[in-house]
């Protein structure tokens, strides 16, 4: 899946799945110039793995798409968030990751926007966009886990603030990712409660089916506190690959609260 951006070749509607061109099998014979994989890696290292350029390159042809899927998305993730990737992938950052490296890259850099769901009403959808900077923290992740699931590892972003269309309220859009979701206590709880997968909502990062944590009654009160939202003013989903996305109504902070707000410790997270 390609990431969205300002380039026309990667534009999409945020409520639709992004689709990569089907990658072709690359022959074993060597390639010269920009199609050489080592050359591509060196080029991206020289530009600090610029996400917009990578999106453009990956959309040029099936060959470039295949190289991006096999090498470039993973190298981008490792380069931009080494600690987070090490925690998510274990001892083998060169191996596979649930949902694929392209989905993790999109989650790192792209705010998916928001739209109305069963438990969260918006007068108009809010478009997704590239996030200039995102901070992911496993400390934040604990606030989104029920008490009996606190051993799970979940990296969460800070909410991305949007002005709600047609109103004065501020919309918060947030995202996160679990480590080894298939083995997690959170998934075990969902299965034990026989929570149904949503019919109309899909993961904006991998396109997988999702559970509503609100419908499953697995949203702890601490999640609203962490987001700066009122209780009941949020909804979030977790997909079968462990990607989390959600929306909330943000409570405006007074100037005194902003000045005295506690800064989170970044030692357990990654600024991307």
UniProtKB/Swiss-Prot annotation:
Q: For this UniProt entry, which segments traverse the membrane?
A: none
Example of a GO biological process term: response to water deprivation
- Segments forming a coiled coil: none
Q: Record's superkingdom?
A: Eukaryota
| S-S bonds | none
GO CC terms, sorted = nucleus
InterPro entries with a match to the protein in the record: EID1-like
- Report domain F-box positions: 29-81
Q: Mind telling me which PANTHER family this protein's record contains?
A: EID1-LIKE F-BOX PROTEIN 2-RELATED (PTHR31348), EID1-LIKE F-BOX PROTEIN 3 (PTHR31348:SF3)
- State what protein this is by name: EID1-like F-box protein 3
User: What species is this protein from?
Assistant: Arabidopsis thaliana
Q: Which gene encodes it?
A: EDL3
């Amino acid at each position: 899946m390609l990431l969205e951006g300002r380039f026309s070749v990667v534009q999409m509607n945020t409520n639709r799945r992004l689709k990569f061109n089907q990658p072709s099998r690359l022959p074993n014979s060597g390639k010269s110039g920009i199609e050489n994989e080592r050359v591509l890696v060196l080029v991206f290292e020289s530009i600090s793995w610029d996400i917009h350029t990578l999106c453009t390159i990956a959309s040029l042809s099936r060959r470039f798409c295949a190289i991006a899927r096999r090498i470039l998305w993973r190298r981008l993730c490792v380069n931009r968030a080494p600690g987070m990737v090490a925690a998510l992938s274990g001892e083998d950052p060169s191996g596979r990751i649930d949902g694929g490296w392209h989905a993790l890259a999109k989650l790192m850099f792209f705010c998916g926007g928001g739209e109305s769901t069963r438990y969260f009403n918006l007068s108009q959808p809010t478009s997704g966009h590239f996030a200039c900077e995102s901070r992911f923290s496993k400390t934040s992740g604990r606030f989104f886990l029920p008490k009996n699931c606190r051993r799970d590892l979940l990296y969460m972003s800070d909410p991305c603030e949007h002005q709600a269309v047609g109103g004065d309220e501020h919309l918060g859009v947030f995202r996160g990712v679990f480590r080894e979701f298939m083995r997690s206590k959170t998934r075990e709880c969902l299965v034990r409660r026989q929570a149904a997968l949503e019919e109309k909502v899909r993961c904006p990062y991998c396109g997988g089916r999702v559970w509503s944590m609100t419908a499953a009654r697995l949203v702890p009160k601490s999640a609203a506190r962490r987001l700066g939202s009122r209780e009941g003013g949020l909804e979030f989903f977790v997909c079968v690959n462990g990607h989390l996305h959600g929306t909330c109504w943000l409570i405006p902070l007074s100037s005194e609260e902003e000045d005295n707000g506690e800064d989170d410790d970044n030692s357990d997270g990654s600024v991307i």
